[in-house]
Regions:
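Ligand-binding loop in jelly-roll beta-barrel domains
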Residues: 200, 204-214
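Catalytic core of non-heme Fe(II) oxygenases with the double-stranded beta-helix
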Residues: 124-194, 204, 221-233
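Non-heme Fe(II)/2-oxoglutarate
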Residues: 8-114, 132, 231-249, 253-258
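A short glycine-rich, His/Asp/Glu-containing loop-to-beta-strand
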Residues: 117-125
Length: 261
């Protein structure tokens, strides 16, 4: 299609491949493209994947065992074991999750220095009908995620919240990903969700008749972060053997005089 411009009356210029124009108060012509495009600038990356199989008997039995050893959380209960991915029964699930953590790092962050995100803590959440997950973030973590062991895709959701101060508050006629303060996604059994650890999230009171079970985890970085030229260089060495210092609600130090230890 030709993009030549043509002269019209009063020496006004319009583009021949633009379908509509509007006359301003100055009698000049302002061109408008037929289909304007709104770009998403600096969007928050939330990754969804799905385990391509059912959970094995060994995995199910391990989860059942953990359900008998729980501690009270705000709104629900969590496993006493805070490193469930270190157990051999979940080795295959850990590999599945690590694959997508690597994918997230490559496709989203795309670092050129040798750096990787590895799983640190991992724990199980048990949410009975009518219970909830309080609104929270995951400090001391880079990417966080959830693998759903038992969830109803028709009723179970995860809510995310926009971070930062809202300068102007306008009543909204039609919610979208630009004007919303929160956004939710349905989740089901075998779904995996990855997101930046700073992103605030929560679960409303569950409506399902079954116990919602999810496996949450954190990650951190290992390798060469930043660069010397920009004075941001940081070398994070080999990961720590967490089995040597893992603490649970049972074996952690008790409150001491003057505060908690």
């Amino acid at each position: 299609m030709s993009t030549k411009k043509q002269k019209i009356q009063k020496n006004e210029i319009i583009d021949t491949n633009v379908s509509s124009t509007i006359t301003a108060n100055t009698n000049s012509k302002i061109t408008f493209y037929p289909e304007p495009v709104t770009n998403q600038l600096f969007p928050t990356p939330v990754l969804f994947a799905k385990l391509p199989r059912k959970f094995t008997d060994e995995e199910v039995e391990f989860v059942k065992k953990c359900s008998t050893q729980v501690t009270k959380n705000t709104g629900n209960t969590t496993s006493v074991d805070r490193y469930v991915f270190e157990e051999s029964a979940l080795a295959d699930l850990k590999s599945f999750v690590q694959f997508y953590v690597n994918y997230y790092m490559t496709e989203v962050e795309s670092p050129y220095n040798p750096v990787e995100a590895y799983i640190t803590q991992s724990w199980l959440n048990f949410t009975q009908p009518g219970e909830f997950h309080h609104k929270h973030e995951h400090p001391n973590s880079y990417i966080s995620g959830v693998l759903y062991i038992n969830a109803d895709p028709e009723k179970d959701k995860i809510y995310f919240y926009k971070n930062g101060y809202k300068r102007i508050s306008l009543p909204t006629d039609r919610y979208n990903q630009f004007n919303s303060e929160s956004w939710w996604f349905n989740v089901g059994t075998c779904d995996l969700v990855l997101f930046p650890s700073y992103l605030t999230h929560m679960v409303e009171q569950t409506e399902s008749k079954d116990t919602r079970i999810s496996l949450s985890f954190n990650t951190f970085l290992k390798g060469y972060i930043g660069e010397e030229a920009s004075l941001t260089s940081l070398h994070v060495s080999d990961r720590v053997d967490t089995s040597k210092w893992r603490k649970t609600e049972i074996d952690k130090p008790k409150d001491g005089r003057g505060g908690s230890i």
